[in-house]
UniProtKB/Swiss-Prot annotation:
Tissue and organ distribution: Ubiquitously expressed.
UniProt-listed GO biological process terms: rRNA processing
Gene3D superfamilies: 2.40.50.100, Nucleic acid-binding proteins
CC terms in the record's Gene Ontology section: cytoplasm; nuclear exosome (RNase complex); nucleolus; nucleoplasm; nucleus
Cited function: Non-catalytic component of the RNA exosome complex which has 3'->5' exoribonuclease activity and participates in a multitude of cellular RNA processing and degradation events. Involved in regulation of antisense ribosomal siRNA production. Involved in response to cold-warm shock.
The protein's name in its UniProt record: Exosome complex component CSL4 homolog
Organism taxonomic ancestry: Eukaryota, Metazoa, Ecdysozoa, Nematoda, Chromadorea
Localization (cell): Nucleus; Nucleus, Nucleolus; Nucleus, Nucleoplasm
Entry keyword annotation includes tRNA processing: no
Principal subcellular localization: nucleus
């Protein structure tokens, strides 16, 4: 992968470390080198005590604040699309921070324990909170068990589903903070709806 390439956690940087020395922001798995943080690939060299040239490859945040604002970071509020739902996680794609829409979507996981505050062992199925193709407002957070992807949380009241559709592609309307209704069939479904701040930019019904 070329220097200055934008990478996310879990992205492959090199097939093998080869001539490089591994620097910060990287980890090795199955002899391949992957990014452990979001940032830009950087390569630099220095002379060791034997005057040999050592090349180091790393992933680091840009010194340009405008570049950093384009990357998901711990504590950032992002808009994401739910791609699939399992027993322990929902797989999501981060699509924007505020009004900045990414050309590249960043893969993320929404763990079951990040759905509601103070309820780490939820007995309810995932579908009571989010479903595939929902758009959610979420916070980027940390999880000691997940190191190769962004981790999302919708535990706070302001976070959750902001846009969803029914089985026929019709818009679903909010009944209350835990329920939506189909504009076509009148059938209700459970969701954890976000109590969205007024200044927050949200996806529209035209989003695919």
């Amino acid at each position: 992968m070329l220097a200055e390439t934008l990478v996310a956690p879990g992205d492959k940087v090199l097939d093998a470390i080869g001539e490089y020395r591994m620097g910060k922001g990287l980890y090795e798995a199955n002899r391949r080198i992957f990014a452990s943080v979001a940032g830009f690939v950087n390569v630099y060299g220095f002379r060791d005590k034997s005057d040999n040239l050592v090349q180091v490859i790393e992933v680091r945040r840009s010194e340009d604040q405008l570049d950093n604002e384009l990357l998901p970071f711990h504590g950032a509020i992002v808009t994401a699309k739910v791609m699939a739902v399992g027993l322990r996680f929902a797989k999501c794609d981060i699509i924007s921070i505020g009004d900045k829409v990414y050309k590249k979507r960043f893969s993320a996981l929404l763990p079951k324990k990040k759905l509601r505050p103070l309820e780490p062992e939820l007995s309810e199925p995932f579908k009571n909170f989010v479903r595939p193709n929902d758009y959610i407002l979420a916070k980027v957070c940390e999880d000691a068990e997940i190191k190769d992807k962004f981790v999302l949380s919708i535990a706070e009241d302001e976070l959750g589903v902001v846009l969803c559709r029914g089985r026929f592609g019709e818009p679903m309307q909010k009944v209350d903070w835990n329920t939506v209704v189909s504009t076509r069939t009148g059938k209700t479904e459970p969701r954890k709806m976000a109590k969205v701040p007024q200044k927050c930019t949200l996806p529209t019904q035209s989003v695919a």
